[in-house]
Amino acid sequence: MPPMERWDFLAMRVRCALYADDPRAIDHLFTMGGYLHEQGDACAWDVARKTAMLLMDTAEDTALPWQWRCQCLDHVARPLGVMQHIGRMSDAPPHLSSEYRRITQALLQRLSRLEIHRESW
Protein backbone atom coordinates (compact mmCIF):
# COMPACT_ATOMS: atom_id res chain seq x y z
CA MET A 1 0.00 0.00 0.00
CA PRO A 2 1.44 3.42 -0.94
CA PRO A 3 2.42 5.59 2.05
CA MET A 4 -0.31 8.21 1.52
CA GLU A 5 -2.98 5.51 1.31
CA ARG A 6 -1.56 3.92 4.43
CA TRP A 7 -1.78 7.24 6.28
CA ASP A 8 -5.37 7.71 5.10
CA PHE A 9 -6.17 4.17 6.27
CA LEU A 10 -4.66 4.85 9.70
CA ALA A 11 -6.57 8.14 9.90
CA MET A 12 -9.81 6.28 9.15
CA ARG A 13 -9.02 3.77 11.90
CA VAL A 14 -8.51 6.60 14.38
CA ARG A 15 -11.56 8.55 13.23
CA CYS A 16 -13.86 5.54 13.45
CA ALA A 17 -12.31 4.20 16.68
CA LEU A 18 -11.80 0.83 15.02
CA TYR A 19 -9.16 -0.08 17.58
CA ALA A 20 -10.34 2.02 20.51
CA ASP A 21 -8.64 -0.32 22.98
CA ASP A 22 -5.25 0.24 21.33
CA PRO A 23 -3.91 3.77 21.95
CA ARG A 24 -0.94 2.91 19.70
CA ALA A 25 -3.24 3.53 16.73
CA ILE A 26 -2.75 7.26 17.25
CA ASP A 27 1.02 6.81 17.54
CA HIS A 28 1.02 4.84 14.28
CA LEU A 29 -0.77 7.76 12.62
CA PHE A 30 1.90 10.18 13.90
CA THR A 31 4.67 7.83 12.77
CA MET A 32 3.25 7.49 9.27
CA GLY A 33 2.76 11.26 9.03
CA GLY A 34 6.43 11.75 9.91
CA TYR A 35 7.39 9.17 7.31
CA LEU A 36 5.35 10.97 4.64
CA HIS A 37 7.17 14.20 5.44
CA GLU A 38 10.61 12.56 5.45
CA GLN A 39 9.94 10.95 2.08
CA GLY A 40 8.72 14.22 0.58
CA ASP A 41 5.18 12.93 0.02
CA ALA A 42 3.61 15.61 2.25
CA CYS A 43 4.70 18.77 4.01
CA ALA A 44 4.89 18.70 7.79
CA TRP A 45 2.42 21.57 8.11
CA ASP A 46 -0.31 19.79 6.14
CA VAL A 47 0.20 16.53 8.02
CA ALA A 48 0.06 18.31 11.39
CA ARG A 49 -3.01 20.37 10.42
CA LYS A 50 -4.93 17.37 9.12
CA THR A 51 -3.95 15.31 12.16
CA ALA A 52 -5.04 18.02 14.61
CA MET A 53 -8.39 18.39 12.86
CA LEU A 54 -8.89 14.63 12.70
CA LEU A 55 -8.21 14.28 16.42
CA MET A 56 -10.56 17.16 17.29
CA ASP A 57 -13.31 15.80 15.04
CA THR A 58 -12.93 12.42 16.70
CA ALA A 59 -12.97 13.91 20.20
CA GLU A 60 -16.24 15.67 19.39
CA ASP A 61 -17.98 12.57 18.02
CA THR A 62 -20.42 11.47 20.73
CA ALA A 63 -21.07 8.18 18.93
CA LEU A 64 -17.55 7.00 19.82
CA PRO A 65 -16.43 5.54 23.17
CA TRP A 66 -15.58 8.26 25.69
CA GLN A 67 -12.14 6.82 26.45
CA TRP A 68 -11.20 6.99 22.77
CA ARG A 69 -12.45 10.56 22.53
CA CYS A 70 -10.33 11.45 25.57
CA GLN A 71 -7.27 9.76 24.01
CA CYS A 72 -7.71 11.83 20.86
CA LEU A 73 -8.16 15.02 22.85
CA ASP A 74 -5.00 14.23 24.82
CA HIS A 75 -3.02 13.94 21.58
CA VAL A 76 -4.20 17.16 19.88
CA ALA A 77 -1.33 19.12 21.44
CA ARG A 78 1.30 17.16 19.51
CA PRO A 79 0.40 18.29 15.97
CA LEU A 80 -0.32 21.79 17.28
CA GLY A 81 3.22 21.89 18.66
CA VAL A 82 4.58 20.93 15.25
CA MET A 83 2.54 23.68 13.63
CA GLN A 84 3.71 26.24 16.18
CA HIS A 85 7.34 25.23 15.62
CA ILE A 86 7.02 25.49 11.84
CA GLY A 87 5.26 28.86 12.10
CA ARG A 88 8.09 30.26 14.22
CA MET A 89 10.90 29.13 11.91
CA SER A 90 12.79 32.02 10.32
CA ASP A 91 12.28 30.68 6.79
CA ALA A 92 8.57 29.91 7.24
CA PRO A 93 6.11 31.75 5.02
CA PRO A 94 4.52 34.62 7.01
CA HIS A 95 0.99 33.32 6.53
CA LEU A 96 1.72 30.14 8.54
CA SER A 97 1.97 32.03 11.81
CA SER A 98 -1.42 33.67 11.27
CA GLU A 99 -2.91 30.39 10.07
CA TYR A 100 -1.64 28.70 13.24
CA ARG A 101 -3.35 31.37 15.36
CA ARG A 102 -6.57 30.99 13.38
CA ILE A 103 -6.54 27.20 13.76
CA THR A 104 -5.79 27.29 17.49
CA GLN A 105 -8.54 29.86 18.07
CA ALA A 106 -11.00 27.66 16.19
CA LEU A 107 -9.91 24.63 18.21
CA LEU A 108 -10.30 26.58 21.46
CA GLN A 109 -13.85 27.49 20.48
CA ARG A 110 -14.56 23.84 19.72
CA LEU A 111 -13.01 22.80 23.04
CA SER A 112 -15.24 25.20 24.94
CA ARG A 113 -18.29 23.44 23.48
CA LEU A 114 -16.88 19.94 23.87
CA GLU A 115 -18.53 17.69 26.38
CA ILE A 116 -16.92 14.41 27.26
CA HIS A 117 -18.87 12.53 29.86
CA ARG A 118 -17.96 9.14 31.11
CA GLU A 119 -20.96 6.89 30.77
CA SER A 120 -22.05 5.08 33.87
CA TRP A 121 -20.57 1.66 34.29
Where are these regions (language model features)?
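Hydrophobic/aromatic side-chain positions at a characteristic register within alpha-helices
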Residues: 17, 36-43
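Flexible helix-coil transition and linker loops at the boundaries of alpha-helical arrays
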Residues: 14-22, 58-69, 83-88
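Alpha-helix capping and helix-coil boundary motifs
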Residues: 2, 40, 65, 89-92
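TPR/TPR-like (Sel1-like) alpha-helical repeat modules
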Residues: 42-60, 84, 88-91
